[in-house]
Design a protein with these regions (language model features):
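Conserved S-adenosyl-L-methionine
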Residues: 185-196
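ATP-dependent adenylate-handling active sites, centered on carboxylate activation for C-N bond formation
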Residues: 1-184, 199-212, 224-235, 239-288
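Surface/interface-facing alpha-helical segments and adjacent flexible terminal/loop regions used
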Residues: 216-221
Length: 288
């Protein structure tokens, strides 16, 4: 929104979604229309998702579940941009979650816990969200500009009283939304429930990945093959698939990723066995 106003001419925007149940496409279109952007929608299928999986893992250098899931859509939309446009520099929104809160940080037991979690997530960015953005974009000869990652901005936001970031307003990321009140974005976009990127592409994408992994291993094969890994042992067939692809390209290097990205399981409401916000009790309207 800021770029569109500052440039004074239509910007190029891109959105990606599954062919059967994309969530964010309609909202991206509304925002693009409001900003008078030159907007492109990239539609993908189950076959596209499965075919992209191995090159995504090879590019990322991770076995982490949520990083790989979220990278599929970004990888494919960046590939489209490289192959079909002359755009080579992208604005992307990484790091707003770490600064202003995830869905699961609604369950933070207090301001100090919220702040400590934000600090942890920022320290680990290079293994998760920033890894995803950097690799998915650069592997297609594109460059990223990450405004939320500006060091002055990060320091400013982290100096705000964390009590003001707690979701006591009935809406996550309240401070960030409030900052864009006015004519920056339509209210329907500004105040809608956020969906995680891997979910917003369409719930079917993660479901397809899980089903594909289930088709590759019997229960016995899964147990035997997962047991080979002492570090960050795969705990689902999906995580085993990702680990085996990782080991194909980065054998014996699993320890460069600290752990599976998960909500803070020590918090009430966050003791879950899947990183998706879909499994949280507060998911609500995020999937609509």
């Amino acid at each position: 929104a800021i770029a569109a106003k500052k440039l004074g001419k239509p910007i190029r925007t891109f959105a990606i979604g599954m062919d059967v149940d994309a969530i964010d496409l309609k909202y991206a279109r509304q925002a693009a229309d409001y900003l008078h952007a030159d907007h492109t929608e990239v539609i993908i299928s189950r076959d596209d998702v499965v075919a992209a999986l191995e090159p995504v893992v090879a590019a990322l250098g991770t076995w982490d579940i949520t990083t790989i899931r979220a990278s599929i859509g970004m990888y494919l939309v960046c590939r489209y941009i490289h192959e079909h446009t002359d755009v080579r520099v992208l604005l992307t929104g990484e790091i707003s979650d770490e600064l202003f809160g995830y869905k699961y940080t609604d369950f933070a037991p207090g301001a100090a816990a919220f702040q400590a979690e934000s600090q942890k997530r920022i320290r680990e960015l290079y293994m998760y969200d920033v890894l995803r953005a950097d690799r998915c974009i650069s592997v297609h000869s594109l460059e990223a500009r990450v405004p939320f990652g500006d060091l002055d901005f990060v320091r400013y936001v982290m100096a705000i009283d964390p009590a003001k970031k707690l979701n006591t307003y009935g809406k996550g990321k309240y401070l960030l939304r409030k900052a864009f009140e006015g004519d920056w974005l339509p209210d329907a976009i500004l105040w809608r429930e956020k969906a995680a990127f891997s979910d917003a592409v369409g719930h079917s994408m993660v479901d397809d990945l899980k089903e594909y992994a289930e088709s590759l291993y019997t229960d016995g094969e899964f147990a035997a093959r997962a047991a080979q890994y002492g570090y960050a042992r795969p705990f689902t067939k999906e995580s085993l698939l990702y680990r085996e692809l990782f080991e194909k390209y980065y054998p014996g290097q699993a320890e460069m990723i600290a752990d599976y990205w998960m909500p803070n399981r020590a918090w009430p409401g966050c003791d879950v066995d899947d990183p998706s916000a879909r499994v949280l009790a507060n998911y609500g309207a995020s999937g609509r």
